[in-house]
Amino acid sequence: MNLSEIGYRRVVVKLGTSVLTSGSRQLDKAHMVELARQMAALMKAGVEVVLCTSGAIAAGREHLGYPELPDTVANKQLLAAVGQSQLILAWAQLFSIYGLHVGQLLLTRADLHDRERYLNARDSLNALLAQGIIPIINENDAVATNEIKVGDNDNLSARAALLCDADLLILLTDQRGLFDADPRSNPDAKLIKQVVNIDDSLRLLAGGAVSGLGTGGMATKLEAADIARRAGVEVIIASGHHPRVIQDAVCKESVGTHFTALENPLESRKQWILAGQATRGKLILDQGALNAVTQKGRSLLSKGIVRVEGKFERGATLHLVDSDGREFARGMSRYSAKDLHLIAGKHSDDIESLLGYDYGDAVVHRNDMVVL
């Protein structure tokens, strides 16, 4: 591979379960060899590669001979615990063919929610890359509960791209990319090759279809792409079975759907707010508050809150939505849900008299907010 043809220097590659199993109930080792070869070629050409791999539960099912996916959380976590060791062993053996070492990082949302743990994870990633070691990331499904799960490896890979300041995120799936209709039911569906802006019409196109044995569909890939591109990371969604797909993507050949990055990406702290934080509640705002936040860059005051939804403590990240339920911003609350139920719709000057204390006039300060 000619280094001059490469447009990126640090790349995150996400492999979905449907890619790793080729639609079967076990890992497709032959295909994994080819994917490892492509990533090894990038490493040899000077491109740093981070691999975000699904497939732990599928590997566990194969190793233990489970015919069907169990219903209980405990048994799914059992399969993840057994399968993760098999998965990392397989990747370690494959990359060793090319003289490359791997390092495993198992993450949960809690690791990304806490600022110190987030920075520690970033340091670990950078240390591995500095030594020419391929970081292999997966969600820690063996211990994760719904409250601390990222939820799918599409979103986890987007967060990994932010963690390591990647230039490109490649989401490989069983589809060629994003289409203007469902290609499985509409033979006239056309591939969308370039996306500059992600809006509601595009989200509607993505739908909620789930691929194969995994948990992520095109909707989750679109969500991941939006997170990454806001942080200045380009994104490509493509078929994991397209010949040379990883190398073609990095060499800027036409493959899949390409999402351009924002020209003015979010600064580091706001990237963390958008990508690392668990969103635990929702604030419905009036039109005046919406305009102040989106058009004037103001902080959110209690007066503009119409309704509070969810249970959360001070410091939680919340969805800020309009009267129709459309999210337009996300931010860290200085007040708990209990507090906000008492001060919603009230003037900031009344907060101390209503609560007996205050944490400032702003419910969500503009420095702790990301306008979407």
UniProtKB/Swiss-Prot annotation:
Q: Which residues bind ATP?
A: 14, 173-174, 215-221
Q: Where in the cell is it found?
A: Cytoplasm
Gene Ontology biological process terms from the UniProt entry? L-proline biosynthetic process
| Signal peptide range | none
Pathway stated in the Swiss-Prot or TrEMBL entry = Amino-acid biosynthesis; L-proline biosynthesis; L-glutamate 5-semialdehyde from L-glutamate: step 1/2
Broad class of where this protein is predominantly found: cytoplasm
Q: What class of enzyme is it?
A: transferase
Q: Choose one Gene Ontology CC annotation of this protein and give it.
A: cytosol
Where in this chain does the record put each PUA domain?
Answer: 280-358
Binding-site residues, substrate: 54, 141, 153
EC number(s) given by UniProt: 2.7.2.11
Q: Which reaction does it catalyse?
A: L-glutamate + ATP = L-glutamyl 5-phosphate + ADP
Question: What Gene Ontology molecular-function terms does this entry list?
Answer: ATP binding; glutamate 5-kinase activity; RNA binding
UniProt entry keywords in alphabetical sequence: Amino-acid biosynthesis, ATP-binding, Cytoplasm, Kinase, Nucleotide-binding, Proline biosynthesis, Transferase
Q: Which family does it belong to?
A: Belongs to the glutamate 5-kinase family.
Q: What function is annotated for this protein?
A: Catalyzes the transfer of a phosphate group to glutamate to form L-glutamate 5-phosphate.
Per its record, how is this protein called by name?
A: Glutamate 5-kinase
State the organism of origin: Shewanella sediminis (strain HAW-EB3)
Taxonomy of origin reads:
Bacteria, Pseudomonadati, Pseudomonadota, Gammaproteobacteria, Alteromonadales
Q: Which gene encodes it?
A: proB
